[in-house]
Amino acid sequence: MQQTVTAKLQILVNPSDRQILCDTMKAYSDACNYVSGYIYKTHDLSRYSVQKDTYYQIREIFGLRSQMAISCIRTVIAKYKTILENQKKWIRPVFRAPQLDLVWNRDYSLNAKNDIFSVNTLNGQIRVCFCKKGFERYFSDGCKFGTASLVSKHGKFFLHIPVTYEISELPDTEISNVVGIDRGIRFLAVTYDSRGRSVFYDGNTVKQKRAHYKALRKELQQVGTPSSRRRIRAIGQRENRWMQDVDHCISKALVESNPEGTLFVLEDLSNVRAATERVRVKDRYLTVSWSYYDLEQKLTYKALRHRQLAVKVDPAYTSQTCPKCGHTEKANRNKKIHTFCCKSCGYTSNDDRIGAMNLHRMGRALSVPDAVAAEHISAAQVRVNVPAM
């Protein structure tokens, strides 16, 4: 099977080339705004008709080369389609930050031997150096580069390249370890594996820092000035970057601390936002804005690269079912003191650990080729095995 990841490559430029790249990126962004205005007026998302009506104007007004003009039109159309899919209404996107979309072997190329990045600009092709550290593995014969984005941040240039490569699938006969992962707020992740080991990833620091960012935004919202709104946007972006780094560290630790042939079993939290009415008003923002999906995505692609697999199962009753005797009752769990105590057999443990144990048990019952069909099996339907203490 194929996997695509986005690799980040730093471009090293001298002052003269820096100005050329800045001018090209600015012209490209201005052209995107021009096309965005045309589409907003016409509501036309046909690439053929948009290209027919704007291609020559883009080249004449902004000086873009042929492939750049076509890439500009594709970028704007894709942006509109994303907005319509998510917002269900016409909102005009504005391209404020300078950017440049580059097609592999047409607009840009990379020379791994000499560490040279060749790119088309308004002034023709230029060649600059790039930092190859951490990128060497992508220069193998099996890797294919896609349309990259050149961006500038804090005076530095970075190339974001989608890289597609082949990976071997993990057959169910090679699964030797099952890890149940319970995600939450008090603990970002709690795991339970086939050797009976439990690991807790504490979330208190993350919770406190997010509360700090929320208080800052609330204070700035009361000011209501343009500068305060810019500050709010910057704080939100900083928080997102920091949270993504936390998810990266956790997913990396999970993958590297488990051997090849590991099956990670997670709860399917697709409808977590729909459950807000069961959460106290003051806790709703924290609950619905938690980055469960980001951690899931990072773990999924990292696991595939290490000959591991991640699947999702129905989370119903995972926190109410005793992993020792199978008794399911809401009263088994005491949320206030974060403790699970079975009303039938008396088995007691941390409630998040119980969730991880039940997910581990459900993972052992899954057949990987039938994982999609078995995703909605519940904890109460799985045969109970006595866990290691």
How would you label these PLM feature ranges?
Residues 1-389:
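Nucleic-acid substrate recognition interfaces
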